[in-house]
Amino acid sequence: MLFELARWLQQFESLFGLFNYLTFRSILAALTALFLSLWIGPVLIQKLSQFKGGQPIRQDGPKMHFSKAGTPTMGGSLILMTVTLSVLLWGDLRNRYVWLVLVVMLAFGAIGWYDDWIKLARRDPNGLKSRWKYLLQSIFGLAAGLFLYFTADVPAAVTFYIPMFKSIALPLTSISFVAITYFWIVGFSNAVNLTDGLDGLAIMPTVLVACALGVFAYASGNTLFSSYLKIPTIPGAGDLIIICAAIAGAGLGFLWFNAYPAMVFMGDIGALALGAVLGTIAVIVRQELVLVVMGGVFVIETLSVIIQVTSFKLTGKRVFRMAPIHHHFELKGWPEPRVIVRFWIISVVLVLVGLATLKVR
């Protein structure tokens, strides 16, 4: 909205031409989301505290988590609210990718909200039944894939690329493209949700990955940079840096309240939405495999659950003391802050490795 106003005012004052620069608007988007989060956060937390009982705690979980009982949840609504407002203010609302990512974020956020509401209303830590959750996620994931495939305006937008191997480019059929899009959106949505089990554990890797994806989006949308870096040129993808910056700002604002010991939990409303956004942006800028590297913490958490469940069903034995794997380290005696910070460190390293692929091609 403000971007459109600035474009109109540019005819009267050249200073407003600053708003044509994505880098300038991305900084404004990040700061707007950050300050909105810090401003709205205390009020929202007070409102969420009115839900009696707060976040239900798993009875089979680590005993130290029982002290978290009563902590308000659904704090992810703060992130979705501030990201949406920031993007509407500073984003180019004529860009279809901007609208797609916003719709995906709000759609998966709605699924998460319903899941959280069931947990609170029924005092059931399991929430919405898995089959219904996956059905709803699948509908939106497939819809996003179909939209991206049939609105693609360049061959690069529907081609699969292997990082560091510029000569490998695999054209995708409609079925394979939609399948990959579905898997990345739904997969990362649930991966971030599985990671969100400790105070601040999921949000910092999300912020880091969002910042890195913003770099890829900016480069992909710029013909000069994408040609130099030998990454696919996707017209219009550059505007996604606004969303990535808004997520970074909102995420840091949320972390202010979610840092150990947390005043509020993200809930599925935030985790499912943010994971879906990361997956969607990675698909748009054709960096699916790079996301697997940069989001390695989310991938490891998910694999630990898959390994645990598979092992127990086949052999009756558990590989980990508890899954997801962050609980395994808790039960080994690691204090919660140590687990969190070490996972953050791993995430920083993996994001740097992902960014390094920009030059290693």
From Swiss-Prot:
One of its GO terms (molecular function) is UDP-N-acetylmuramoyl-L-alanyl-D-glutamyl-meso-2,6-diaminopimelyl-D-alanyl-D-alanine:undecaprenyl-phosphate transferase activity. The keyword Transmembrane applies. The keyword Nucleus does not apply. GO terms for cellular component: plasma membrane. It catalyses: UDP-N-acetyl-alpha-D-muramoyl-L-alanyl-gamma-D-glutamyl-meso-2,6-diaminopimeloyl-D-alanyl-D-alanine + di-trans,octa-cis-undecaprenyl phosphate = di-trans,octa-cis-undecaprenyl diphospho-N-acetyl-alpha-D-muramoyl-L-alanyl-D-glutamyl-meso-2,6-diaminopimeloyl-D-alanyl-D-alanine + UMP. The chain crosses the membrane at residues 26-46, 73-93, 98-118, 139-159, 168-188, 200-220, 237-257, 264-284, 289-309, 339-359. Catalyzes the initial step of the lipid cycle reactions in the biosynthesis of the cell wall peptidoglycan: transfers peptidoglycan precursor phospho-MurNAc-pentapeptide from UDP-MurNAc-pentapeptide onto the lipid carrier undecaprenyl phosphate, yielding undecaprenyl-pyrophosphoryl-MurNAc-pentapeptide, known as lipid I. Belongs to the glycosyltransferase 4 family. MraY subfamily. This is Phospho-N-acetylmuramoyl-pentapeptide-transferase. The lineage of its organism: Bacteria, Pseudomonadati, Pseudomonadota, Gammaproteobacteria, Lysobacterales. The gene is mraY.
